[in-house]
From Swiss-Prot:
Required co-factors: [4Fe-4S] cluster
Binding site for [4Fe-4S] cluster: C102, C136
Keywords: 4Fe-4S, ADP-ribosylation, ATP-binding, Iron, Iron-sulfur, Metal-binding, Nitrogen fixation, Nucleotide-binding, Oxidoreductase
Entry comment on modification after translation: The reversible ADP-ribosylation of Arg-105 inactivates the nitrogenase reductase and regulates nitrogenase activity.
Gene: nifH2
Name recorded for this polypeptide: Nitrogenase iron protein 2
Catalysed reaction equations from the record: N2 + 8 reduced [2Fe-2S]-[ferredoxin] + 16 ATP + 16 H2O = H2 + 8 oxidized [2Fe-2S]-[ferredoxin] + 2 NH4(+) + 16 ADP + 16 phosphate + 6 H(+)
Modified residues (ADP-ribosylarginine): R105
Record: residues binding ATP: G14, K15, G16, G17, I18, G19, K20, S21
EC number: 1.18.6.1
GO biological process terms on file: nitrogen fixation
Organism of this sequence: Nostoc sp. (strain PCC 7120 / SAG 25.82 / UTEX 2576)
Amino acid sequence: MSIDKKIRQIAFYGKGGIGKSTTSQNTLAAMAEMGQRILIVGCDPKADSTRLMLHSKAQTTVLHLAAERGAVEDLELEEVMLTGFRGVKCVESGGPEPGVGCAGRGIITAINFLEENGAYQDVDFVSYDVLGDVVCGGFAMPIRENKAQEIYIVTSGEMMAMYAANNIARGILKYAHTGGVRLGGLICNSRNVDREIELIETLAKRLNTQMIHYVPRDNIVQHAELRRMTVNEYAPDSNQGNEYRILANKIINNENLKIPTPIEMEELEELLIEFGILESEENAAKMIATTSESKSK
């Protein structure tokens, strides 16, 4: 069954621990508040892409249930698709046990099952929440198979988050010319790094995209998470809730979809040195020499 072309298929990518699932769920909750009909397809083996929507530890995954039944064809849509906050439809694809098989298989199996069983009916946005620092064929599947059309990379001013963002941009570029996938922007999930906004705006420019929004750091996010809720539900009148609404509105109205221009590692390191995130080799050598001298005394 083909997917209605009017449905906007977006994906959130980002390195592990960056706050990708938290950012995506809070943003999608805000979009649902604005009347958008949302389907979330969790593509992370942790199966934590929907827990704030459902107020639960982790949703039972398509792959887990299929293994219990013997085949994915034995499942009913209602068993794997639950309804959460503001009517958001929630599915987790799941993955195999650690060290066994390819986690990408769960993504492929789940998406095919959902398409064939009508999960994409009556929705405005389908959102794929994808583990982003593993750039393998399975995790790239929403891009490779021309499912996700708009990619949003959750990053911060930390070196590894930026490194992952550049890698993801490289993955998007690989499939941009054969399909319709485009980069919608970088979402800076703040880590309070010095000059963070300027740094991510500079990286975005180098990648031929935009920093679509800067999400400030606020403990209310953790308070809501402890109660397994989105900020929009836990503290709807909070400043942080409004930040997610601003981001949601920007995504809904975003037409700035570009083919990215990933940079070489040397250029990324030069950028990090320029902003004081990374020491130059010369300065690092001086620091090591100074440390060695002080120890010998």
